[in-house]
Amino acid sequence: MKEIVLASSNKGKIREFTNIFKQKNIKILPQTDFNVSDADEIGLSFIENAILKARNCAKHTGLPAIADDSGLEVFSLNGEPGIYSARYSGEHGNDKANIQKLLAKLTGNDNRNARFVCALAYVKHEFDPAPILAYGFLEGKIAHKISGSNGFGYDPIFILPQLQKTLAEISETDKNKISHRAIALDKIMQLL
C-alpha cells in the first residue's frame, strides 16, 4: 500500500483524507506521526501555502506528501479573509472571534456573495519540480447571523443557496459530498 504524509494535525481533516484515500489503496499518515511541525504559511495564495506545507512534510519524512490550504473569500471585501481565514481575528483557530469580525465588517453590506476555496498540493519529494495541484470551490452567501451546530470555522454563516441552509445545518456526510475540499480531493485523486 502506498503511503502519503498529510501535512495536518487536524483530526477532522485526517479522518476525511484517510477515508477518501483508502478507496485508492493509499494510506494517509498524519505529520504528527513523525513529529513534523507546521510549516510557516508565508505564501500569498492558498496554493503557495499548500506547496510550502507539502514540501515541509516531504523534507522531514522522506515520503511523498499532500497538503491543503483552505479559506473563505468574501467578494465585497476583496477576498477577505482569504489566506488569513483561520487567524482573521488575530488569534489562530478562534472560530467565534473570526465569525464576529467578519459579520461586523459586513454590517450594512448587501453583497454577501462568497466562496470557500481549497488548494491541494502533492509532492513526491521535497524538491519535486512539478507538484500535482488541484482546486475546489464552493459558492454561497454569508448569513446575517449564526445558524446550525455542525461543522467548524465559518460553516455556521455560510449559506448554500440551493438548500437555503448553512453548512452547519447539514450533516457531515452531506457536507463531505459537496464541500470545496471534497471537490479538490476528487480532482487530485484522478491525477495520482
UniProtKB/Swiss-Prot annotation:
Residues that, per the record, bind Mg(2+): 40, 69
Gene3D superfamilies reported for this sequence: 3.90.950.10
Keywords from the named record: Hydrolase, Magnesium, Metal-binding, Nucleotide metabolism, Nucleotide-binding
Highest taxon, organism lineage: Bacteria
Binding-site residues for substrate, renumbered to this chain: 8-13, 70, 152-155, 175, 180-181
Pfam families xrefs: Ham1p_like (PF01725)
Named cofactor requirement(s): Mg(2+)
SUPFAM superfamilies in the cross-refs: ITPase-like
GO biological process entries: nucleotide metabolic process; purine nucleoside triphosphate catabolic process
UniProt xrefs under CDD domains: HAM1
Catalytic activity from the UniProt record: XTP + H2O = XMP + diphosphate + H(+); dITP + H2O = dIMP + diphosphate + H(+); ITP + H2O = IMP + diphosphate + H(+)
Record has rRNA-binding as a keyword: no
NCBIfam families: RdgB/HAM1 family non-canonical purine NTP pyrophosphatase
Protein name per Swiss-Prot or TrEMBL: dITP/XTP pyrophosphatase
Native species: Francisella tularensis subsp. tularensis (strain SCHU S4 / Schu 4)
